[in-house]
Amino acid sequence: MPSAGMICNSGGVIFYNPLNNIDGMISIVYNNTDDQVVIRGENKFMPAKIFEELSEEKRRRIIAACITEFSEYGYTGSSTNRMIRNAGISKGSLFQYFRNKEELYFYVLDCVIQELTEYLEAGSKALPEELFDRIIKYAELEFSWYIRNPEKGRLIIDASAGKDTAVCQKVEERYRLKGQDIYDSLLEDIDVSMLSGDKQKTADILKWFLKGFNEDFNTRISPQEGMDFGGLQHDYVKSLSDYMEILKSGILTGEKER
């Protein structure tokens, strides 16, 4: 998972995509005329103000029920009736908070991806300076979140699964921007003393490799109950490490004898 993304194969690590990450959700400012909000400078539709006025416990309970439903059934197969029942709220109240199921889905997905983003940002501070080790450790860091949060992990994976659906197209559009910032942060403070040639071109080669590597890896997995994220981590890191060794040593064995 270290550098590219599962969100509609947008590019870089396995599931979440640090090369194409979400464009924010930090500050929420309500408009007085409707319930539109500004998120990091962009207009997004968020839940009605009444939802934010609920107790934190109730909001968490509703979100948890929605995560469970979306992760198990996906967007298309999910039932708002089951969400309402599992959240313990009155029928119809859910749509006092959200205009429709799609708005609810993206709000929940935003929350989950924001949680992953903050986890990666915090963990990235302790990554090694050596470039190739840093990429591998970042992969392990991201997988560790999925292992701890399998339900949320399935939700993120499922968001990218239906590549031809209108919702997945919106997922890709929503989360593909501003990824370069995350990629740049991954390369901050690295030890470049051992790199040869143009450093920017080296970074570009790594980015292209990670995008292709992750897209290929992602085609071989699918969201399902009881996903073995530990096994996926082992396979991913082992394969990534093998390719990192090839990149470090080069693909030529030496000059041919004449």
Region spans (language model):
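Amphipathic alpha-helical segments used for helix-helix packing
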Residues: 146-167, 215-226
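Short amphipathic alpha-helical elements of helix-turn-helix/winged-helix folds
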Residues: 65-69, 145
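Short coil/turn segments at alpha/beta junctions that flank glycine-rich nucleotide-binding fingerprints
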Residues: 72-76, 127, 149
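Helix-turn-helix
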Residues: 61, 69-103, 107
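C-terminal peripheral helix-coil segments that are non-catalytic and often amphipathic
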Residues: 6-45, 184-188, 212-258
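Amphipathic alpha-helical packing segments from all-alpha helical-bundle domains
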Residues: 114-117, 121, 125, 129, ...
